[in-house]
Amino acid sequence: MTDVIDAKPEEAKKVPPEVEDEDSGDESAPEASAAGGEATKKKKKKKKPKKKKKAAEQSEPPRVGLSKLFPNGIYPEGEIQPYKDDNAYRTTSEEKRYLERITCEDPDETYQNIRKGAEVHRQVRQYAQRTIKPGMTMTEIANLIEDGTRALVEENGLEAGIGFPTGLSLNNCAAHYTPNAGDTIVLQQGDVMKVDIGVQVKGRIVDSAFTMTFEPTYDKLLEAVRAATNTGIREAGIDARLGEIAGAIQETMESYEVEVNGKLIPVKPIANLSGHSIDRYTIHAGKSVCLVKNDDQTKMEEGEYFAIETFGSTGRGRVVDGGECSHYARKVDAPHVPLRLTTAKSLLKSINKNFGTIPFCRRYLDRIGESKYLLALNHLVQQGIVEDYPPLYDQQGSMTAQFEHTILLRPTVKEVVSRGDDY
């Protein structure tokens, strides 16, 4: 520890008495004294400049709530993409700009809610990208991400918090894996890990994902999926048809190959996974953006939110359920079923209070004090009240990758709210 030396004020310098001479009675002396007195007075009046308040900065690991970093409540806008073709007029339309202003005045609809969630996402994921290393357990990685999310979004019940369980799916597991209690899986040097993070503010969910590798073998797989996601974003827009967007995604994805052990393997889009529309407190709102061309003539509409996500694989390009389930969500249209199990009634009450229709995992139930709940949870699933989302796997030995962004179809422009410098 550095020794701090006390800085004592300098003692007044003693002027040695001068030898008196015949001029010691000079009349100018009083004038000089008076001038010195005036100077002393002026010095006393001089005020020290006020120190400017230092702007709040994010900590490492990130724990500073965003309201402290953005005290005016205005959060960074996402990437803006103008509409094209028949919708190009929207960018300059007075009518559409007026509609956008009205939307922003509604405290529930304001874009600031989703932009806050997006900024939380960017700061948390960029810390995760710097920090995650082989040798860490899946539980350590999940906690690293979720602790940061809770702190930055300033978790407050259903008002703000985690948007869904942190996905950490490895290798041929494409989606819906997060560690349950007691999980001992350790991240390996050769793993391909999909990191899917959700943040919600007043029910506005930001859903964005990226893929991490620690050696170059599967770089082309990641490049293919990232390019396919950006193609989907480019083609998305008001009145865009979902089937046509899917065709563009497929074309981009299939233009890539990966070389593994001297063999070229085509990258396939995972045909039975898709992007989706998002509603308040509802992660899957009904519309699907598939990854292979189809005849779906459904159109995207003004004001809608979409998660544009693509998955690529070196395997079959199809996934099946497998492994221990961790992800669950209460159904939006859950039936009113009389529950005979007292434990199921109690668990449902807890789910409604803490999560509503926001997806959750077993670790989150542990965190709120629930125990011995598996029988009750399975009963709620069997009764159609809660949906389970088991992990999804392509064939053994294959590798899968994912990239995803949340977009907002504003009346005037398309905003990629979760875009960052990283992807």
UniProtKB/Swiss-Prot annotation:
Its main location: cytoplasm. Substrate binds at residues 176, 284. Residues 1-89 are annotated as: Disordered. Residues 18-29 have a biased composition (Acidic residues). It catalyses: Release of N-terminal amino acids, preferentially methionine, from peptides and arylamides. Binds 2 divalent metal cations per subunit. Has a high-affinity and a low affinity metal-binding site. The true nature of the physiological cofactor is under debate. The enzyme is active with cobalt, zinc, manganese or divalent iron ions. Most likely, methionine aminopeptidases function as mononuclear Fe(2+)-metalloproteases under physiological conditions, and the catalytically relevant metal-binding site has been assigned to the histidine-containing high-affinity site. Cotranslationally removes the N-terminal methionine from nascent proteins. The N-terminal methionine is often cleaved when the second residue in the primary sequence is small and uncharged (Met-Ala-, Cys, Gly, Pro, Ser, Thr, or Val). This is Methionine aminopeptidase 2. It comes from Schizophyllum commune (strain H4-8 / FGSC 9210).
